[in-house]
From Swiss-Prot:
Catalytic reaction annotation: a primary alcohol + NAD(+) = an aldehyde + NADH + H(+); a secondary alcohol + NAD(+) = a ketone + NADH + H(+)
Residues annotated to bind Zn(2+) 1: 38, 66, 152
Pfam families: ADH_N, ADH_zinc_N
Name of the molecule in the record: NAD-dependent alcohol dehydrogenase
Binding site for Zn(2+) 2: 96, 99, 102, 110
Matching SUPFAM superfamilies: GroES-like, NAD(P)-binding Rossmann-fold domains
Record-stated family: Belongs to the zinc-containing alcohol dehydrogenase family.
Gene of this entry: adh
Gene Ontology molecular function: alcohol dehydrogenase (NAD+) activity; zinc ion binding
Keywords: Metal-binding, NAD, Oxidoreductase, Zinc
Annotated source species: Sulfolobus acidocaldarius (strain ATCC 33909 / DSM 639 / JCM 8929 / NBRC 15157 / NCIMB 11770)
Matching PANTHER family: ALCOHOL DEHYDROGENASE 1-RELATED, VACUOLAR PROTEIN SORTING-ASSOCIATED PROTEIN 11
């Protein structure tokens, strides 16, 4: 099989031939149709992600890519509910089933995870071995191209908005509203929560996309006075930060209303400012970090997409061989919505 392999952190992926994985008990071999291109893939390529999760550092070479949809081609023993030719979306956040977090249904925080494309081989190759069939979900109405970004951008945005505790009476600011996660978040915030949405993005293309998806107000330069004006003087009830830079975490928390929630998803180096900590009590603020969603979140966001309530905004389709180009586009800020690789 052909795959894009990471041999050394910080270097481009290499297109190579490798053996098709062998299938064991409870495992499934999937032919990859499409793989989404995520900022996490960039972080894996550079190795930066393992500064935060050093216990999950992989042995190289590694096939990266964790937003994976494709077709079942081989099933191991004791696999139930699937057959060859089923079209599936794979939940890449695979737990060992035995740690505390798996037992409470938060497998994505497993102490000994098998994260596809992060510490075990993922979707930038013609075939991927799913270590546990329970982390696969059949597709009914969705194409594999449309479905693939749901595995990370969809479920992560869904979880962040759930943690924000939104309803139609509340407002939410989405930072990075034109990106892969932000564009899904705008749709969820509007369709499911009915909230007033302020979309923030640095690109005009991203702002146009957020507007088309239902954002009520968009801007590339946040003005505190204007934000308070459009939120009846209170400020925003929630901020979903898909960037998480020093600039966003330092400058936007002051826009929170009393009892507001700041949900940090992005990992671009920003931390909680000292002043924010001092004001937690008087304002009743909550600062929440989230990695991604659990299997319940995964099922719910997939159902939303199957029913046409949300749709990943795929703005560019590239070949497997163009994986480095796709990652470079993302790194240079040239992408709104989501890029996907057509693998087979």
């Amino acid at each position: 099989m052909k795959a894009m392999l990471l041999h050394k952190f910080g270097e481009p992926l290499r297109l190579e031939d490798m053996d098709v994985p062998k299938v064991g008990v409870g495992q499934v071999l999937v032919k990859v149709d499409y793989a989404g291109v995520c900022h996490t893939d960039l972080s894996v390529r550079s190795g930066a992600i393992f500064n935060r999760i050093s216990s999950s550092k992989p042995t190289l070479p590694l096939v990266i890519g964790h937003e994976i949809a494709g077709e079942v081609v081989e099933l191991g023993g004791n696999v139930e509910g699937f057959k060859k030719s089923d079209k599936v979306l794979i939940d890449p956040w695979i737990g060992d089933g035995s740690c505390h977090y798996c037992k409470i249904g938060e497998d994505q925080y497993c102490d000994n995870p098998k994260w596809l494309g992060i510490n075990v081989n993922g979707g930038y190759g013609e075939y991927v071995l799913v270590p546990d069939y329970r982390y696969m979900f059949k597709l009914r109405n969705l194409s594999t191209s449309t479905a693939s970004p749901l595995a990370c951008s969809g479920v992560t945005a869904y979880r962040a908005l759930r943690l924000a505790n939104l309803d139609p009476s509340k407002s939410v600011m989405i930072i990075g509203a034109g990106g892969g996660l932000g564009s899904i978040a705008v749709q969820i915030a509007k369709a499911i929560h009915g909230s007033f949405i302020i979309g923030v993005d640095v690109s005009e293309e991203g702002l146009k996309l957020a507007t088309n998806l239902g954002a009520d107000y968009v801007t590339s330069k946040v003005d505190e006075e204007e934000v308070r004006k459009i939120t009846t003087g209170r400020g925003v009830d929630a901020i979903i930060d898909f960037v998480g830079s020093e600039f966003t975490t330092s400058n936007y928390y002051t826009l929170l209303a009393k009892l507001g929630r700041y949900v940090k998803v992005g990992t671009y180096g920003g931390g909680l400012p000292h002043d924010a900590g001092l004001r937690l009590h008087s304002m009743g603020w909550q600062f929440i970090g989230t990695l991604t969603g659990n299997r319940k979140d995964f099922l719910e966001v997939l159902e939303l997409a199957e029913n046409g309530k949300i749709k990943p905004m795929i703005t560019k389709v590239l070949s497997l061989e163009e994986a480095n180009d796709a990652l470079d586009n993302l790194e240079k800020g040239k992408v709104s919505g989501r890029q996907v690789l057509k693998v087979t």
